[in-house]
Amino acid sequence: MKIVPPRGMQDFLPHEKEHRDRITEVIYKSYISHGFNPIETPSLENIERLACGVGQENEKLTYKIIRRGLTGAQTVQHPDELIDLGLRFDLTIPLVRFWNTNRARLPKIFRSLQIGHVWRAEKPQKGRRRQFIQCDIDIIGQPEILAEIELLVATLSTLEQLGIRTPKLHINDRRILFSMLNNLGVPHSCHVYVSIVLDKLRKIGLDLVKQELCEFPALVAYLASSVNSNTGSTDLCFDVSSTKDITHIRRTIQSALPHGCKFDCEDLCRIIASVNEFTQTGVFFDPLLVRGMGYYTGPIFEILHDDYSIAGGGRYDGLVERLGGLPTPACGFSIGFERVLGLIKESVSLDPKKMILLYDPKVDPNLVVSVKLEFISKGFIVRPELASRSRRNQIELAKREGFGAFLYLDPLSPPDGLLAKVKPIL
């Protein structure tokens, strides 16, 4: 029997879990300060909701749950009815279901905060596991661009608190993307397929993308002239971080689009100007930015660090209605926790109120518990540990876990005055 976790999943040692919890706490407190309300949704959703077509490629990666109580004959005769549930592959679809279920008890404009696990049955690689954490904020019921501005400013502020100070914000609009595809001869019926292929540009490279899109020669020619074939990065990422002048931003966006491609980009220009007003982040208009989910309908954005995506989101106005609710505007942003974690060096600071209680084997167990409870009442974190012959090694190991103090308890230790005998770990 294998003793390792399933492929693409991971155990975390105590010090690793503490490090992850510290980062989660920073994200949580930052988003709370921006007025977002924490919620929790189930890990499982009905399969018809997860497979409704809005998740695009991620729907193929859904972990599916076989219905309980089926007989062998049912399993063979009705294979399509085997599955009724699946593990969520993102937090947005569960959020929309949550909104449709609880709408009457929620504010008209609802600011949601979710931090939780999601699952995708994909090939594990660096920075990509089958079980991972997403940190999502969403605003449901707000049609104005204030939603996008709030989400962007809150997320960039949170990343700064985590010590990530040089991210780049890439921004586009799904409507600009589709207008550009129309201009390049891609029929409306092929927009979703072409978007899926373009979204894989960084992963599979220009040559493979050109092969998959060979039936659209104008688009292939546009890509060949604007994409670095070695890196998959686009030469059309126009820097719009140096100005709050909406007219200048509008001209920059129009100059990035193919000749003859026109679109009202006023909202996008105002969003960019506002981000420049409130943050020092580099902002780039990227006409080839897609974002993988099929539910996006308007502005879309992605935050990169060293050309590595660490967060992304956008507006998805049609999703609430598509999943059974009333027409409702919505917009969201998600931090990829595992990717952000990789940018933050784990550091251990010694806590003087975190104490290891070393006790002699002859000490009465009731005394150990009594001393432990006494120090807990004084605000200490206490871990009893049987003293070994090499107490120095024990203390050194405790130090690596952030313990900043220790106390040695022997049978002759007086019950009073123990606080004065606590020694710092240096």
From Swiss-Prot:
A GO CC term attached to the entry: cytoplasm
PROSITE patterns according to UniProt: AA_TRNA_LIGASE_II
Highest taxon of source: Bacteria
Keyword Zinc-finger: no
Main subcellular location of this protein, as a coarse class: cytoplasm
Classification via InterPro entries: aa-tRNA-synth_II (IPR006195), aa-tRNA-synth_II/BPL/LPL (IPR045864), His-tRNA-ligase (IPR015807), HisRS-like_core (IPR041715), HisRS/HisZ (IPR004516)
Reactions catalysed: tRNA(His) + L-histidine + ATP = L-histidyl-tRNA(His) + AMP + diphosphate + H(+)
Coiled coil: none
NCBIfam families: hisS
Family named by the database record: Belongs to the class-II aminoacyl-tRNA synthetase family.
Full protein name: Probable histidine--tRNA ligase
Species annotation: Tropheryma whipplei (strain Twist) (Whipple's bacillus)
